[in-house]
Every structure is written in structure tokens, then in C-alpha cells.
Amino acid sequence: MLQPGNYSLVLSLQFLLLLFDLFVNSFSELLRDPPVNQLVLFILQDVGILFAAIVLFLMLFNTFVFQAGLVSLLCQRFQVTVILCAVYIALSISLHVWLMNLRWTGANRFVWSDGLLALFVLQRFVAVLYFYYYKRTALSMGDSRFYHDSLWLRKEFARVRG
């Protein structure tokens, strides 16, 4: 079970990962002069997003609800967050690969095509949704109902079985 001291540590880690992701999204265009700098930032950002998703899944798997077999309840409750995690990592990797492909050969020339600009805007829009839902899910995972047997859980179990 997740203890209160451990929860605050995990929550701090999750917020730190979100803050780093926000930093890279905000300032990666300013740090592009040698392309290798931007490449390292993009790799660290993608690894951070994957690590944040792993931490989120570990928190979901650690709940009493999951251990009681009500996986469908967790999936229903946090479905949007899980889908946004997958979409956001796919958009981020796509944008990073496209940008690095264009910038590696000519770092000082204009590389913004219409498709790249559309992908950039879409990735930034999904990033806002991802940040909101991820933070909301991370904070709601602190609810004590998820970590011990309760009347709410028994009612949900009866509803699923009946």
C-alpha cells in the first residue's frame, strides 16, 4: 500500500517530471543552436514522459481497487488520462523526429513547413490537456478510498457483479 510519506514523494516526482516537460516545451526552440543540444533535450523529455506514465501505472496498480479486481473501475475513471499519455508521447516523438531530421542538415535555415507547424500546434495543445489530466489523476490517487476496503468499494463491486 502507498503510505502518506511515500505518496508525497511520488507526487513530488510526478510534478518534477511535469515541470521538466513544461520547461522543454517552452524553451527548446531557444536552445537549438547546436542541434545536439536540442537532441539531448528531446531525448530527456521523451524519457521523462515515459517515466511519468510508468509512475502513473505503478500508482494505479498499487491501489486496493486494482488488487480487488476492479480494473474496469480504474480504467473507466482514468481512461482519458491514459489515452492522453499515449497520444502525447506519440505526438512528442513525431515532432522531435521531424524537427531533428530537418535541423540536423541545416540548423540555420527556415524549416517550418505547414505540416510541421500543424504538428507543433497539435502537440502543444495536447500537452496542455495532458498536463491538466495527469495532474488531476495524480492528485486524485491520494484519495484514501483507493487504498483500503470501504463501503464505496463494496457498492461498486456489487454493481459490477450484479
UniProtKB/Swiss-Prot annotation:
Glycans are attached at N6. It is found in: Vacuole membrane; Cell projection, Cilium. GO terms for biological process: cilium assembly. It is a multi-pass membrane protein. InterPro entries: TM_138 (IPR024133). The keyword Ribonucleoprotein does not apply. The chain crosses the membrane at residues 7-27, 41-61, 80-100, 110-130. One of its GO terms (cellular component) is cilium. It comes from the Eukaryota. Keywords: Cell projection, Cilium, Cilium biogenesis/degradation, Glycoprotein, Membrane, Transmembrane, Transmembrane helix, Vacuole. Belongs to the TMEM138 family. Required for ciliogenesis. This is Transmembrane protein 138. The gene is tmem138.
